[in-house]
Amino acid sequence: IQAALDANDSSETDRLVLKITPGDYREKITVTKPGVTFANADVTAKRAVTIRASYYSSNTFDADGKFVPQDEFDLGTNKCATVTIGAGATGFSAYGITFQNDYNVVDHTAAGEQTPAVALNTQADKVYLKNSRIIGRQDTLYVQGAGNRVYVDGGYIEGTVDFVFGDANAYFAGTELHMAAFAGKNNGYFTAANTKKSGVGLVFDRCNLTVAAAYDDDAKLSLGRPWQTFAQYTQVRKGDGSSYVTGVDLGTKNSAYTDTSSAVTYLDSTMSSKITKNRWNVWTSKNQSGKSVDVTFHDDVRFAEYASHDETGALLDPADYKNVVLGSMSALDEAQVQAKRAELLAALGFGSAAGQWVVPDGAWPFAYDPNYSTGTDVQPTQPGGNASPNADSAAMPETGSAIIAVVVVAVPLLVAGLALVAVRRNRQQ
């Protein structure tokens, strides 16, 4: 896939559509050009196109606070994503694609091994994802870049800790957010926004928040916590790079993050009964004795929940939730829900007015082909690469011999041994 990207130019008005045959693609990909589309050749998406790799962040630092990689796969949170949509890749879209980071999902799954491992990092404006799956554990989907707009249309996102995070303005319509289980863990956070004060943040509309059966009734699962909306605190960094908090002034904003104001909104969404009654969590750090200390600047946190309902469809009554942490919980009637939805979409910059983004209509970028819509899932045929150090090789997924069709006028190309047919499509208006 990376070779196909490198061999073809594109723009927002002369799009490059990669029509990808179902199968596993084990590679780390960076999209740098505007107007690129990844599309599953099976329009029904019953057979998966899975892009997978296994890189991570150990969050290891030296005494000066400099990141210290532990091996060649330890790239840090900003660089470990399986697929990165770079800042110049305006207008990227994906249809029926699975983005997966195998770290902590397929390999390194033992208790104590959970660590950030991003599956998809979007750094561009006007990113559109249709019926796609994003799979990881901690830090699965990173929507990055203040003012950037991301629209997630349906699909599925899976993780355990902060698995939708970042400072972009992102709207999720009818998406399932699944809290996966991890060995030795009985807690998790759906989101970790570090929205700027001018941003709207993460908006989840008519979404379904589900939780793995492995979590018991004592699980501490929250809708999110406020990344970088910190109060002023002091800390000591030890020789091994670890640090601990020595003091916190909750009434003063942290001078390093004066413009951060974490914002997350849930609207008309279905909530698992296993989500905490407190709904949200503060951000904490450890003190010298190992106790968690609240370091959140509460006044700048913008968490809201509107018209949530349980698995049966019954509306949740805010009166039953007396100790909501940080955010607000409101009951709305249908007219109020519609008004709030319109308000949020306009604030996010979606629409047809000047300066707004006309979001794609969701139609697949090419016609239905029954040849890609029958039979069972593609079976991998060749051993995969990029196994993480100490990974169980027997558990590593394999790579199928799949074909990419690049949707320039039916001209066959050959890139990196893959048959390519390029077709251009103008930008959707």
Where are these regions (language model features)?
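Sequence-level preference for short, compositionally simple segments enriched
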Residues: I1-V378
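C-terminal low-complexity, Ser/Thr- and acidic/Pro-rich disordered "stalk" regions positioned immediately N-terminal
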Residues: S373-S401
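C-terminal membrane-anchoring or membrane-association module
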Residues: V408-Q429
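Alpha-helical transmembrane segments of integral membrane proteins
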Residues: A402-V408
